[in-house]
Amino acid sequence: MNSAIYPLGRLGVDDYLQGEQRAEVKHEYLDGQIFAMGGASRAHGLLALSLSALLLPHARRKGCQLFTADMKVRIDHDSGSWFYYPDLVLACDPTDREPMYVRRPCLLVEVLSPSTEHIDTREKLLAYRLLPSLREYLLLRQDSLQADLYQRAADGRWQHQRLTAPGDVLTLECLGADVTLSEIYVDLADLSVA
């Protein structure tokens, strides 16, 4: 199935969610409009898998759930709803158990690709900040050793940290976990970080 399973025009949330169960291609949803998502590169997949493997033991210890790529995040705002598919979603709220999406993530991760970088660094950055539960948003480049971490401070303001050296330590407060960039990028030897 593809986008043809969706009716033309504005789409309601229920129709979108039902369509996604049958769709062969994932779609993000922005106030009634759907946008098909493309496939990921090898580097993209390796980065997401590596970080997932590093974080999963911490998530289990904290009683959190870690999802990769196929879990939607729902953002409700004044004029409607948005659904995105982050590369990693960490949900630590035990009451956040919708079967098809997460409403209250603690951490969201996007691996940047050339076709989506402008969306991940602008649109999604602004949209994700609307989630009161979100404490951290991590962006990983797949073409160079670089991580951009946005963290919500106690006063509600967002702080940005860029890491670019193999030994730089990424501290994820949601999990109380520290990982180095070299651990995340271990499978990308062509970036000379392994």
Q: What does each model-found stretch correspond to?
A:
Residues 1-194:
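Gly/Pro/Ser/Thr-rich low-complexity, intrinsically disordered segments predominantly at protein N-termini
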